[in-house]
Amino acid sequence: MGNPFVHVELMSNDIGQAKTFYQSLFDWKLNDVPFGEMTYTTIGVGEGTGGGMMKNPVPGTPSAWMAYAAVDDVKAATAKAKSLGGAVMKDVTEVPGMGWFSVITDPTGAMLGLWETKKA
């Protein structure tokens, strides 16, 4: 399997301003969804890869977009990234009913999310 980008996510320091900006710029359909103790905003784009927005979980860091690549086994891919000189920023975490993700950095410091969809 190739590993396509399957999701993009904005971690914003001002989620209200970001929502107004992107909805006005692209006419995206935004939907706020309660997710544990936070609200996650899904981005509907029609065709193409959708995504989401959330409050930046790391205070003091700039707002940034992050892409997620599909993998067959997120635990194995995370371990492989580490063995190749990458670092694990967020270990494998379950998204109930949907799948699992981790966040890695490559040896240059660039972040990438890894996503494994739950099999039916």
Over which residues does each language-model region extend?
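Vicinal oxygen chelate
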Residues: 3-6, 10, 31-34, 78-120
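Conserved short beta-strand elements that form part of the metal-binding/catalytic scaffold
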Residues: 28-62, 72, 107, 111-116
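Short amphipathic alpha-helices within nucleic acid-binding modules
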Residues: 21, 75-80
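Short beta-strand micro-motifs in enzyme catalytic cores
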Residues: 39-41, 65, 98-102
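Helix N-cap motif at beta-to-alpha junctions
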Residues: 14-15, 72-75
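Eukaryotic phosphotyrosine signaling hubs
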Residues: 5, 64-65
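Core segments of cupin and vicinal oxygen chelate
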Residues: 2-5, 9-48, 83, 95
